[in-house]
């Protein structure tokens, strides 16, 4: 999908929430969506990073985004319900949701997985994603044509040694997406996954410290697929898992 050329007004008048919007793919997605007409809601745990993305968007002349400082690790379903009501009160609807926030944890043998780290990865990569989506469904249903995009990984389709915790969280992500896609297939909201592939991010450097980052795609390079799934040109795509860098 990276040969997709999005019209500049692809996301005009759309309200899109991006999690993990402070850096990496999330920050680039927010800036790209804003450049294509969206009003972005920037969610992340580090206010200074969100403010930097906010400044980039405003200085580029795009719609002023909203900032939601939230640490998914400590958030409860009640936090998400309150956020959802605020979005409805302020914007009336939610047209798009990009679940980008996730953590890797440490790669280790399955027998050595730390129980607390397992809980932390599942809280951020799975539980927070599930409860946030659950809370936001009423706002999504108020949109004319809403899109929810989950972030997956190749290890969420085929398990790999030493990737146990992260892989299980991404297998679960695929399952959540498929379940929701089937439940809402007759409604005005669609659910899909996106696999960014090897990309020049901090998480990639953590997983592959010896890898040359200059050999990898940048977050900007993979944005066409992110635009495609969020825009109305993918309105008939539901329950799919797309690769930004197909082999």
PLM region descriptions:
Residues 186, 193, 201, 210-247:
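C-terminal helical subdomain
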Residues 83, 108-110, 114-119:
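Substrate-binding pocket helix/loop in short-chain dehydrogenase/reductase
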Residues 15, 20-24:
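Conserved glycine-rich cofactor-binding loop
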Residues 133, 169:
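Active-site helix of classical SDR
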Residues 158, 179-189:
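Active-site-adjacent segment of SDR/Rossmann-fold oxidoreductases
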Residues 153:
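Residue(s) in the substrate-gating loop at a strand-loop-helix junction
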Residues 38-53:
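Conserved glycine-rich Rossmann-like NAD(P)H-binding loop of the short-chain dehydrogenase/reductase
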């Amino acid at each position: 999908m990276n040969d997709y050329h999005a019209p500049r007004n692809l996301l005009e008048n759309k309200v899109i929430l991006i999690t993990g919007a402070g850096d990496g793919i999330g920050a680039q997605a927010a800036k790209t969506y804003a450049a294509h007409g969206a009003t972005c809601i920037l969610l992340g745990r580090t206010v200074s990073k969100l403010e930097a993305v906010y400044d980039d968007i405003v200085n580029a002349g795009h719609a002023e985004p909203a900032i939601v400082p939230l640490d998914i690790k400590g958030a409860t379903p009640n936090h998400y319900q309150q956020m959802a009501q605020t979005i409805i009160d302020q914007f009336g609807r939610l047209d798009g949701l990009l679940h980008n926030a996730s953590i890797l944890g440490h790669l280790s043998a399955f027998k050595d997985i730390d129980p607390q780290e397992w809980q932390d990865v599942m809280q951020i990569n799975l539980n927070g994603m599930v409860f946030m989506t659950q809370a936001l469904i009423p706002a999504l249903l108020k949109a004319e044509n809403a899109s929810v995009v989950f972030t997956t990984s190749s290890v969420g389709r085929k398990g790999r040694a030493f990737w146990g915790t992260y892989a299980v969280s991404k297998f679960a992500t695929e399952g959540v997406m498929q379940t929701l896609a089937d439940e809402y297939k007759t409604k005005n909201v669609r659910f899909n996954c996106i696999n960014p592939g090897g990309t020049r991010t901090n998480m990639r450097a953590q997983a592959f410290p010896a890898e040359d980052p200059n050999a990898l795609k940048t977050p900007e390079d993979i944005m066409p697929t992110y635009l495609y799934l969020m825009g109305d040109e993918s309105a008939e795509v539901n329950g799919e898992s797309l690769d930004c860098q197909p082999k």
